[in-house]
């Protein structure tokens, strides 16, 4: 499961991100996400997070593990890139499966056009009255969404209660990360 969000923000955010990933960061539009790979100097894989481009000058590396935040800070130890690199207080909840679209519509209303949201598309929304980033993504291999709650340590209960309440009519099942689903989906 995704547990950590490492933010790269500043005037050189795109340039720095492009330097550390194997994909072309300049081709990732704001409010889109992509699967990316970070390699060491020999080409060995360090991590393979989902990268969210929140704005022109802000990226989130969405990680399940590792110290990529420290690695990124080390890459920029000489401050040649004008960026801030930090772990932010944003935590995701996944809504996955064939009922995910209907549940999400009940949860956030018509504030986001979920019917036309592309895979790896992002949108700003509120859940339980709290600021979130929504992505159409997940590792279940089925339709799904991830809700990234901002200021999660303060507002997790508000978001969680809203998700559980909206999920009642959809027979929401709360489960822990199912890593076998990711393997079955070829992710």
Which residue stretches match the model-derived regions?
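Basic, glycine/lysine-rich polyanion-binding surfaces/domains
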Residues: 1-187
